């Protein structure tokens, strides 16, 4: 699902109930209380999806940090993914319980991801992708293909990212539109 779906549910239904009055807003600011409130709300949310949901996939745009925090603390079975049309579509992702806050997860098997020209201070650079799902080129557009795919076959995503020490990818923004 695109993040907008779960964000709308959280921001219009769940969060207003958890912060409905001054007392609840005060309690919500206490981390261990917030976690308990999120756990209760997460169970209710799971029931609205039929109670049998094993995985709720999120991708297509960044997930709002407060919504991801809710999903984590609620124990909601969500999984993050990253990909592009040109990569048919998924290149990195997680399974429920394996996600890391703000990360799209590690590269999928058979897919290589590297960071091009990483910044010396932050480690951020353009995300390059290589693998069997990466397109061969843009239809009848050799100039655009040459701009997007390096001579050695790496697709230039135009996205900025960085890896953690365990190979989890974090999207940091756009290099180009």
Model-derived regions: residue spans:
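Active-site glycine/GP-rich loop and adjacent strand/helix microenvironment
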Residues: 61-62, 66-73, 89-95, 104-109, ...
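Gly/lys/ser-thr-rich phosphate-binding loops in alpha/beta enzymes
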Residues: 1-8, 175-177
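Conserved ATP-binding/catalytic segment of the ANL
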Residues: 107, 111-114, 121-177
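Gly/Ser/Thr-rich phosphate-binding loop
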Residues: 7-99, 112
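Short, flexible, glycine/charge-rich loop motifs used to bind or transfer phosphoryl groups or to couple energy/partner
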Residues: 43-47, 69, 102-104, 117-118, ...
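Alpha-helix N-cap/helix-start capping motif
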Residues: 3-4, 31, 61, 132, ...
């Amino acid at each position: 699902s695109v993040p907008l779906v779960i964000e709308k549910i959280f921001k219009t239904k769940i969060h207003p109930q958890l912060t409905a009055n001054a007392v609840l807003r005060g309690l919500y600011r206490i981390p261990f209380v917030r976690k308990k409130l999120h756990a209760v709300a997460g169970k209710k949310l799971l029931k609205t999806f039929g109670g049998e949901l094993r995985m709720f996939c999120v991708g297509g745009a960044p997930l709002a940090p407060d919504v991801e925090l809710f999903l984590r603390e609620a124990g909601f079975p969500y999984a993050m993914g990253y990909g592009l049309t040109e990569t048919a579509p998924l290149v990195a992702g997680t399974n429920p319980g394996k996600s890391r806050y703000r990360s799209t997860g590690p590269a999928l098997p058979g897919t290589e991801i590297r960071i091009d020209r990483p910044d010396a201070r932050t480690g951020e650079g353009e995300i390059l992708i290589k693998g069997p799902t990466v397109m061969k080129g843009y239809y009848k557009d050799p100039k655009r293909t040459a701009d997007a795919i390096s001579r050695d076959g790496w697709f230039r995503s135009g996205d900025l990212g960085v890896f953690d020490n365990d190979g989890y990818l974090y999207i940091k923004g756009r290099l180009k539109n």
